[in-house]
Amino acid sequence: MDKRISIAIDGPAAAGKSTVAKVVAKQLSYVYIDTGAMYRTLTYAALEQNIDIENEEKLMEVLQSIRIEFQQGKDTQQVFLNGQDVSEVIRTPDVTNRVSIVAKHRLVREEMVRRQQELAAQGGVVMDGRDIGTHVLPNAEVKIFMLASVEERAERRHLENMRKGFSSNLEQLKKEIAQRDKLDSEREVSPLKKAEDAFELDTTSLSIEEVVRNIMAIVSEALQK
């Protein structure tokens, strides 16, 4: 199995993309690239500098001045901002509730896509996000579009928040996730949408193991081609 392909996993907020993508990458010994973490890191950096996240020009100045890197830790992938581990702080509700605003800016997305394509150039990657199959890796050999109900996604995010010790309100999360869906699907630049050649996977009633099994079956088929 020497062939190394690119795998694009897209879907709305809290659909379980990152969790599944990490497992798939590990099973294949591929590199996992969390594009959402890149936007989160920029959001965190902008908030730290009190930058108005509606101001694209200011955001671009921040983006050009920062280095975002990934390192594979023992069990998880770590995200570094200018050499500092920000894996946990970019997952706080503060960042989560603002990242869609940062991600809607055209110039920001263009620069992020350039960086993401650079990271994926060698193949052997699993990349997840909102526009991977449609925009970042349009030629990916495997494209997955993960779906789940707002209720299910809010429940997952709620449990994740509780586990991390963040305060969490399930009803509030439902509203926030629905709002992020709206922002992500209606933005002018690379909106969230399923690529025509993507496999759609509704994960509402599936366990992580079942989702991974489904994806690995699709990958195995692609590797035979």
Curated annotation (Swiss-Prot):
GO terms for cellular component: cytosol. ATP binds at residues 11-19. It comes from Bacillus cytotoxicus (strain DSM 22905 / CIP 110041 / 391-98 / NVH 391-98). PANTHER family: CYTIDYLATE KINASE, CYTIDYLATE KINASE/PANTOATE-BETA-ALANINE LIGASE. This is Cytidylate kinase. It holds the Pfam family Cytidylate_kin. InterPro entries: Cytidylate_kin (IPR003136), Cytidylate_kinase_dom (IPR011994), P-loop_NTPase (IPR027417). GO terms for molecular function: ATP binding; CMP kinase activity; dCMP kinase activity. Belongs to the cytidylate kinase family. Type 1 subfamily. Keywords: ATP-binding, Cytoplasm, Kinase, Nucleotide-binding, Transferase. Its main location: cytoplasm. One of its GO terms (biological process) is pyrimidine nucleotide metabolic process. It is found in: Cytoplasm. It catalyses: CMP + ATP = CDP + ADP; dCMP + ATP = dCDP + ADP. It is an enzyme of class 2 (transferase). Its EC number is 2.7.4.25.
